[in-house]
Amino acid sequence: MQIFVKTLTGKTITLEVEPSDTIENVKAKIQDKEGIPPDQQRLIFAGKQLEDGRTLSDYNIQKESTLHLVLRLRGGMQIFVKTLTGKTITLEVEPSDTIENVKAKIQDKEGIPPDQQRLIFAGKQLEDGRTLSDYNIQKESTLHLVLRLRGGMQIFVKTLTGKTITLEVEPSDTIENVKAKIQDKEGIPPDQQRLIFAGKQLEDGRTLSDYNIQKESTLHLVLRLRGGMQIFVKTLTGKTITLEVEPSDTIENVKAKIQDKEGIPPDQQRLIFAGKQLEDGRTLSDYNIQKESTLHLVLRLRGGMQIFVKTLTGKTITLEVEPSDTIENVKAKIQDKEGIPPDQQRLIFAGKQLEDGRTLSDYNIQKESTLHLVLRLRGGMQIFVKTLTGKTITLEVEPSDTIENVKAKIQDKEGIPPDQQRLIFAGKQLEDGRTLSDYNIQKESTLHLVLRLRGGMQIFVKTLTGKTITLEVEPSDTIENVKAKIQDKEGIPPDQQRLIFAGKQLEDGRTLSDYNIQKESTLHLVLRLRGGMQIFVKTLTGKTITLEVEPSDTIENVKAKIQDKEGIPPDQQRLIFAGKQLEDGRTLSDYNIQKESTLHLVLRLRGGMQIFVKTLTGKTITLEVEPSDTIENVKAKIQDKEGIPPDQQRLIFAGKQLEDGRTLSDYNIQKESTLHLVLRLRGGMQIFVKTLTGKTITLEVEPSDTIENVKAKIQDKEGIPPDQQRLIFAGKQLEDGRTLSDYNIQKESTLHLVLRLRGGIQA
């Protein structure tokens, strides 16, 4: 298709593009036509600056759309904006940018309207019409963002389908205003809305305060229908949308109505009825879809995404996120929505507690995933729940909690529906309506969880001897459950089993459905042979502890053994081996820790801090550290984030190269200090590969490497099979048999990785 690009001089350029072209590809085409380097181009559409890694279709840019080209004059710089939640945002700016421009950039990143932003620098509030240079704001300065809330409040509107909408309102809003807000969110015309509160229908001319509707009140929305018929559309998240349609409506019309209600572009929608995908040009009556039929909506996705957060009260919050958001960012968004401080939030996914510094994509959290939010309560008590697989779950409870509440908490942690749970204590099955104190269950008591199963599917497990075992399972079974079933059949203890599917080792806490294991899939069973061994753990005080372990023990198990010996809670322990911080879910053998190896134990003192690391490419990385962290620890964190081996890193602060064995506090490195990272290269060269999620991978290559070799290196790092990879450079797709030097790809060039998804759909 053709699009137009209009420059500030009034000149209009015509480009030939595809909807799947990235903004970067478009900039390369502009460079071909006009000679303007991509890093000096800023493209604007519908008032929004376009990001390199996103595609034209992500921004709904269609044929004959006009983009605006603004030039970034040399002397761009980065500044930081710190919010009250402690989150730090990085912005690309020019000294000549106005405060208004900066607020618009913050809106693009964080979604906060400019009129709710107050920016503070050097204790002074900044005025919209002034520039950064007026205030002497230079590169790497930190501004502080304070929100101006205006006496508004939130209310909820519940529809007959069970969907709950959240609205921002004022007590002085009329019912008419509220209906207009519902129309903005849901596309329902006001004249089809009836609002009910406390059993009373609300009149248009009256205000919320007339009806004593206060913050977090729930109104009920009933539709007044006329003609036509209703059908339901069910999404993968279980949400049901109600549509008003005619039998003669085409599938295309239906997708347009879904777009009006939910904002999902038609080209991202696939509709299924009676197991069949519906074609755009056909009508509802062609498919015999009648009133109150239910269609299923499956999304073809790319770019930003929605996730859900479910609280223990059953409330579900919807968040707009990117796969590259950290858990810390997510907690800040929850604080913005719900007012819960991040340090009281624990987020659980697939039965695992999520760590602040990791990203959503690290945990394979995808669009429309549901996280569970558990509050760390002051008071209360802890109890343990032991499953038949030997796994122990820790719950925060009150003595007055009912058994039903406890089962709900187990569901939040493990995803097991309450009606499949039986809880046993002191040999007795516990009844739903009774409380923990009725059964004299006290702090640190252990309950036993037995599952009642139903339904399910068969899978096969193939051993190295060629024997195939058949198992009855549920998609919601954890890998741990599967190992317990193998133990029942074959007598092999779970801790000696490693299960492999699609070339990947399966982790105990994840479920079969997490790995997309379906009926009649075949898993491969590899045995971990016994051999207990001793390792040593050395503390900063010089004390050495001896532990009895197995190579298959996880780092979590090791921390539990240290807690048994020394009383140090696992969440205050950081274990270091060979200069690398060890992750809870990995095993000793994953890190090649052998008998009589020595680990180093560093305590996480409350009161970590953030520092910044700036690379030669201008990229800034944010790290969570302690003043007591060694330079070695910091390099390990950089390796975790960027994949750069510690022995290739040189860190510079205040003009001095930092030595591995010294700590941050030795060098007086304080919160928000910026270190500089210089790479020591040996032979070869480095290139960068940028994914659509914005993640950048660093690869060591030779100019003579083929594109095929490069794809193999990406597979080693990211696990993406070569036949699903398309590599783009300077707007051109690279062919497997050609070399990097054929394409003039030099050191520190950036390639773009686009995935080819099974079934010919491109993401």
Curated annotation (Swiss-Prot):
Pro-peptide positions?
A: 761-763
Q: Does the keyword Cytoplasm belong to this entry?
A: yes
Q: Where is this cross-link: Glycyl lysine isopeptide (Gly-Lys) (interchain with K-? in acceptor proteins)?
A: G76
- Which positions does the site annotation Essential for function cover? H68
Site annotation (Interacts with activating enzyme) points to R54, R72
Which processes are annotated in GO (biological process)?
A: larval midgut cell programmed cell death; macroautophagy; modification-dependent protein catabolic process; protein ubiquitination
Q: In the record, what terms sit under GO molecular function? A: protein tag activity; ubiquitin protein ligase binding
Covalent cross-link site, Glycyl lysine isopeptide (Lys-Gly) (interchain with G-Cter in ubiquitin): K48
Query: SUPFAM superfamilies, per this entry?
Result: Ubiquitin-like
- GO cellular component terms, semicolon-separated: cytoplasm; cytosol; nucleoplasm; nucleus
Q: Which residues form the Ubiquitin-like domain?
A: 1-76, 77-152, 153-228, 229-304, 305-380, 381-456, 457-532, 533-608, 609-684, 685-760
Q: Which UniProt keywords apply?
A: Cytoplasm, Isopeptide bond, Nucleus, Repeat, Ubl conjugation
Q: What else is known?
A: In Drosophila ubiquitin is encoded by 3 different genes. RpL40 and RpS27A genes code for a single copy of ubiquitin fused to the ribosomal proteins eL40 and eS31, respectively. Ubi-p63E gene codes for a polyubiquitin precursor with 10 exact head to tail repeats.
Q: Which family does it belong to?
A: Belongs to the ubiquitin family.
Protein's job:
Ubiquitin exists either covalently attached to another protein, or free (unanchored). When covalently bound, it is conjugated to target proteins via an isopeptide bond either as a monomer (monoubiquitin), a polymer linked via different Lys residues of the ubiquitin (polyubiquitin chains) or a linear polymer linked via the initiator Met of the ubiquitin (linear polyubiquitin chains). Polyubiquitin chains, when attached to a target protein, have different functions depending on the Lys residue of the ubiquitin that is linked: Lys-48-linked is involved in protein degradation via the proteasome.
State the protein's name. Answer: Polyubiquitin
